[in-house]
Amino acid sequence: MKFGNLGVWFFFDGLSSPDSAKAAQRIESLGYSILWIPETVGKNPMVLASWLLANTKKLIVATGIANIYHREPGVTLSAQQSLAEQSNNRFLLGLGVSHKPIVEGVRGLKYGPPVATMRKYLEDMEASPYTGVSGSEVPPTVIAALGPKMLALASE
């Protein structure tokens, strides 16, 4: 997947679905090749990605980032494969461990050691069954890295 040197990161929570589609179309018309969408406590990034991909022609849509604590690894794999297949491989899955105050304070979940937790999550994703139709390419996964140990994992 090639996505050029310049993309856009945009927070869509304040926009309606029709306005989100128009914004993505505008971003695409301006020549940007990739649109990064975050995950907080608003719109589901996988659902939003599906909508934006369905309303653009060549724009790559990437989660930047999807929080691994918000969904089970097999569910993430299924979403990744489905989005890649329905968009002709224009979906890029970006994952991250988020931050302890968000995971524990906002979501009420237990925050684990970042690198070990991410490694286990990726292993569990890879081991998860998926029986749906796959795209012509293996969809890429990128991970957010805030330090050298996570950066080393990202390079694997």
Regions from the PLM with identified roles:
Residues 1-56:
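N-terminal beta1-alpha1-beta2 module of alpha/beta enzyme domains
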Residues 17-20, 45, 73-76, 114-121:
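Aromatic/hydrophobic pocket-lining residues that form the small-molecule binding cavity
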Residues 47-50, 74-82:
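Pocket-flanking alpha-helical
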Residues 31-33, 55-59, 87-89, 153-156:
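Glycine-enriched alpha-helix->loop->beta-strand junction motifs that scaffold or abut catalytic
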Residues 77-156:
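Internal, glycine-rich beta/alpha segment that forms the wall or movable "lid"
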Residues 4-10, 33-37, 60-64, 91-95, ...:
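Hydrophobic faces of well-ordered beta-strands that scaffold small-molecule active sites
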Residues 11-13, 40, 66-68, 96-100, ...:
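Active-site beta-loop-alpha junctions enriched in small/polar residues
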